């Protein structure tokens, strides 16, 4: 996958796409990638796609709980935020000195090396 854990992504689709600031202007929501599921091509983004989960009582805990947690979203609904320009960008792969390297297509900046 072209998105890694710890990177900042912009949400392109879904109910969490926009967030309103103090002046009422809509802005695209961004978040940090917490976990990547490569087989299903889904990611968990911090503070995005919050779902309510009802946990039944267990033997250790006497009471059940209602927990809010992030649910996975498909990787096609997000775009990487370019670290240089702070805008959403596509990720490209090129070969540099015999290794595959990811780069941001808008700024042409190398992101990191891929093993």
Curated annotation (Swiss-Prot):
Q: What are the GO BP annotations of this UniProt entry?
A: translation
Disulphide bridges, residue numbers:
none
Q: Which UniProt keywords apply?
A: Ribonucleoprotein, Ribosomal protein, RNA-binding, rRNA-binding
Source organism superkingdom: Bacteria
* A GO-annotated cellular component: ribonucleoprotein complex
State one Pfam family annotation.
ribosomal_L24
Mind telling me which CDD domains this protein's record contains? KOW_RPL26
InterPro entries tied to this protein: Rib_uL2_dom2 (IPR014722), Ribosomal_uL24 (IPR003256), Ribosomal_uL24_KOW (IPR041988), Translation_prot_SH3-like_sf (IPR008991)
Q: Which GO terms describe its molecular function?
A: rRNA binding; structural constituent of ribosome
Q: What does this protein do?
A: One of two assembly initiator proteins, it binds directly to the 5'-end of the 23S rRNA, where it nucleates assembly of the 50S subunit. One of the proteins that surrounds the polypeptide exit tunnel on the outside of the subunit.
Query: What NCBIfam families does the entry give?
Result: rplX_bact (TIGR01079)
Q: How does it assemble?
A: Part of the 50S ribosomal subunit.
Report the sequence similarity comment from the record: Belongs to the universal ribosomal protein uL24 family.
Protein name (Swiss-Prot/TrEMBL): Large ribosomal subunit protein uL24
Q: Kindly list the organism's lineage.
A: Bacteria, Bacillati, Mycoplasmatota, Mollicutes, Acholeplasmatales
